[in-house]
Amino acid sequence: KQVYVLIDEYDVPLAKAQSYVYHKDMVTLMSSFLGFLKDSQKDPETNKPVVKKVILTGCLKVAKNSIFTGVNNLKVNTVTNKIDNYTGMIGFTKEETLKLLKDYEMEDFSEVVRNNYDGYKFYDKEMFCPWDVLNFVEDNFNFKQQGLLSEIEAENYWANSTSSPAVYEYLGFLTDSDNQKMQDLVDGNSISFVLNESMNYDCLSEHDPNDFWSLLLHTGYLTLDWEKTKKDELSKDNSSNKEVYVRIPNLEIRKCFKNDIQKRFSSVFIKHNLHNKLVDALSCGNQKETYDIFFDMLQKYVSI
């Protein structure tokens, strides 16, 4: 029989290789490993390809990635696509989540689950994170049965299930405008940027702020704001720049965003701003301001 090949998170090795500076070697290795995509062998008895279909999932789009050079007939679906055959497949729908909670007599906590684990929007579907919902039910079902309702908590499960070292490639390369965008997101607002749908890990060395925000969208820290993003922007082909609006999907991700992204990047922004002020003070010969800045830096960054 012909086989279906399922490959989840195909680009994780590429992301780790980028962080440890052996990306080219990993591209060579994976190109060889995925060689069957380019030339599938045929069954000598049926004369049909051994592999019927391959399904890959990953953070970044597969079409332009260098490991897929020579691969044809790729059908790509991203977080901005409107193909409704796929929009409800990536997680639990609202109806599926409510049914699960009812099955375990935990429907009274549907609002808690919605606030913490809902919020992703894929065109026409509102999606819950399955990992979060299942863990919430498993961890709290016994408390519900025993009447210990005060013990029921919405834990942060996403923080322990994801790692995006590629995001930190942008430390020191973002602007004050990007810092403000982070604050806007944490405050519950949407921000806009030019989406790079064809980015791959080769692009990280360019440190384009738009790629930074694109990466956060692709890795789940953000979700598309379909109401604010103009339809004609999403209708553009992949060679065109698309201005999109994004937001943080829920309370769980907001906590992760503040701890993983904003906190780490904000410290760099502070150092960068002090550096600029120090250069200006020295250039102008302003002794008092130079002294004040040095004193501030010593207090912040030196243990005496």
Task: Please provide the spans of the model-predicted regions.
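Residues immediately C-terminal
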Residues: V12-A15, D39, V62
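Extended alpha-helical interface modules used as scaffolds for assembling large macromolecular complexes
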Residues: L74-K75, V79, F128-L134, N140-I304
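Phosphate/oxyanion-binding active-site loops and adjacent basic polyanion-contact surfaces
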Residues: Y22-M30, T93, P209-F212
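Conserved P-loop NTPase "ATPase switch" module shared by AAA+ and STAND
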Residues: Q2-H23
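Amphipathic alpha-helical segments of the small helical/lid subdomains adjacent to P-loop NTPase cores
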Residues: K64-V71, N77-E138
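Aromatic- and carboxylate-enriched substrate-binding clefts and catalytic-loop regions
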Residues: H23-T28, K53-V54, C59, T69
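Substrate-engagement module of ASCE P-loop NTPases
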Residues: D25-K52
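Structural recognition of the conserved hydrophobic beta-strand(s) that form the central parallel beta-sheet
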Residues: Y4-D8, S32, K52-C59
